[in-house]
């Protein structure tokens, strides 16, 4: 059974587990719905050639179907790096984040040995380069894996909770208070805020968020993955004003960061489309 077939077998189990997870109040990165909104926006902005090749490589499925595949793949990724999930160095357990320098530029992940693994931007650069050069000759498993990881990483790298800053390597991994309720701040960005702002389907959310003109989109997709990472880190830095134990007023928080959330979801979608359009030109 190839990786694409295994995914659909696993997905039946995942959907069942998601129902339990949602009842327990937990969430996935950006929120499953947030990732789906990003990919739905991206799908709308693919060139006909890129869409045709993605349809072929994904077995006729939409990229939206694989928006959160990488979250389900984390343990397998560790095995590929020759670690067990239980004994991997802590930094290797977070391959869906990236580290920013003091000026918010993306940490050049190949400078310090295996520390590059925590840098999803660095990994995405390598995957995109490999796909562009070799997608016609790759086996189905390898090609699917690289496409699915790029789909997810472009969403993750735009999420404020997935960016690490000098002196703050927490990825928002601490509790804050909303009223008398303790909430993991990372989770506030990984689904909760999106669900507050967009309680309807991800399709409705994508339509509401995808509001930029062609000229604005052209400006957003300028540069490369490192430029996009710096832009995301710069825009997201203000979210770290809330520290461990901070009291958050829900209404004020929504007013302060609703525009940022929509911007990051939207930018991730436009840039994902641009990346695939360049790879499959």
Show which residues each predicted segment covers.
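Sec-dependent signal peptide recognition
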Residues: 11-16
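Repetitive helical segments and hydrophobic/amphipathic motifs
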Residues: 20-21
């Amino acid at each position: 059974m190839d990786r694409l077939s295994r995914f659909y077998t696993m997905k039946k189990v995942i959907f069942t587990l998601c129902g339990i997870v949602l009842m327990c109040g937990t969430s996935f990165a950006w929120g499953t719905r947030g990732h789906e909104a990003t990919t739905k926006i991206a799908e709308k902005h693919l060139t006909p050639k890129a869409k045709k090749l993605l349809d072929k490589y994904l077995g006729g499925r939409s990229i939206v179907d694989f928006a959160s595949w990488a979250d389900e793949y984390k343990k397998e990724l560790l095995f590929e790096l020759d670690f067990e999930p239980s004994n991997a160095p802590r930094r290797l357990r977070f391959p869906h984040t990236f580290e920013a320098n003091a000026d918010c530029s993306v940490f050049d992940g190949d400078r310090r040995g295996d520390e590059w693994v925590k840098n999803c931007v660095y990994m995405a650069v390598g995957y995109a380069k490999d796909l562009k050069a070799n997608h016609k000759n790759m086996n189905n498993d390898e090609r699917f894996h690289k496409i699915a990881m790029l789909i997810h990483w472009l969403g993750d790298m735009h999420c404020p909770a997935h960016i690490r800053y000098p002196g703050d390597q927490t990825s928002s991994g601490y509790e804050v208070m909303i009223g008398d309720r303790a909430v993991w701040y990372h989770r506030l960005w990984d689904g909760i805020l999106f669900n507050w702002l967009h309680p309807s389907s991800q399709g409705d959310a994508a339509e509401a968020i995808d509001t930029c003109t062609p000229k604005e989109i052209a400006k957003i997709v300028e540069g490369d993955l490192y430029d996009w990472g710096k832009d995301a880190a710069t825009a997201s830095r203000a979210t770290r004003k809330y520290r461990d134990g901070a009291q958050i007023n829900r209404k004020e928080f929504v007013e302060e960061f609703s525009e940022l959330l929509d911007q990051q979801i939207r930018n991730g979608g436009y840039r994902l489309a641009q990346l695939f359009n360049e790879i499959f030109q």
